[in-house]
Amino acid sequence: MFRPLLRRLVIGLILQSAAASSVQAQTTDDLFNDSVVQTLEITIHSRDWDTLRANFTSNDFYPADVTWNGLRVRNVGVRSRGLGSRSGVKPGLEVNFAHYSSRGEFLGLRALVLDNLTTDPSMIRERVAMAFYRRIGIPAPREVHANLYVNGDYAGLYVIVEPVDTVLLQRYLGENAGWLYEYHWLTPYFATFLGENLDLYRPYFEPRTHQTQSTFDLFDPVRELFRTINSAPTGSFRDALNARLDLESTLRLIAGEGFMAEWDGLLGYAGMNNFYLYRPPSSAPARLFPWDADHTFQAADYPLLAGAAENVLMRRMLEDPVLRARYFQLVLEAVNAASSGNWLVNEITRDYQQIRDSVLADPFKPYTREEFDSAFAELLTFARTRPAFVTSQVQQNR
């Protein structure tokens, strides 16, 4: 009499254990699996959600629960985020798992960014750009589209973005004990030497690690980096700068930006923008990490060297014959990475087809269906014609 009951109980426990193990076995690779549109749920007090949207220019955090694929994290901090993309209708969000508990995390991540996709009618530029950076060997955040639900209601299509933080540094570099700075655009800045006063560098380079250290410890190396960029003698410029900034990865990053017609990056039309600076704890040179690439793929005939003459770093690197030759070689490698196997065309097409239903269902998107489809067509034209244009630019300038 009891044996069938016992057998059912044992089977139930086994199935329950297997299900739990399946949930526990999930990793960030599953979260950033871009073969599907992910689903993310936020449960937050309705009053807090209304306040967050009403005060969308504020950075105040509100407690919430976050659920993904059966995993639920309680009492995380959620706030509005962004610069020009801030919105009270479809707010960009930061989800900080460690805001209310220093030990808080989700799949090893301390935070996530939810990009609201309000500045790009194609809604795929950011994700395609970061995938391209990774394809050409640049450490870049992982990204994946997700349908976001808030308190059970569809809040629209977002992109989940991996933040540039100590977790990302550890994954890419194998260490994270150094100094990480987030660059902030304040005024047009073109890598000039700001002067001896260390406080002049603080507004542009916000420390994201070691924030309690002295002003000297935090900003003297930053000042000396820009002193070297501006003042190192021509004959020793390359060696002097390479001791402070990894020139190979910097040139590779700028080559990627150049191919993608990024007009709001290191060579931005209004000065440098959208990057992080990392100084390792050893004597190794600093590295740059890209961020916020939703202004890429702007025009197929955008000049490859746009902004190069104004930016002191790029201008001086191009004046060095070795660095100039290497830069144009890396640009051609970027062209090949985009063209090989029709990668860029295929990536744009795949992403568009994957998200189209979610875009059309998004009640808060600031674009019409026609604008979305038109933006996709423009991206395809870019992908098909940009390689030949950039190749001709290299031939004219190398």
Predicted regions and their residues:
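Bacterial N-terminal signal peptides that target proteins for export
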Residues: 1-10, 16-18
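Phosphate/dinucleotide-binding and metal-coordinating scaffold of catalytic cores
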Residues: 25-398
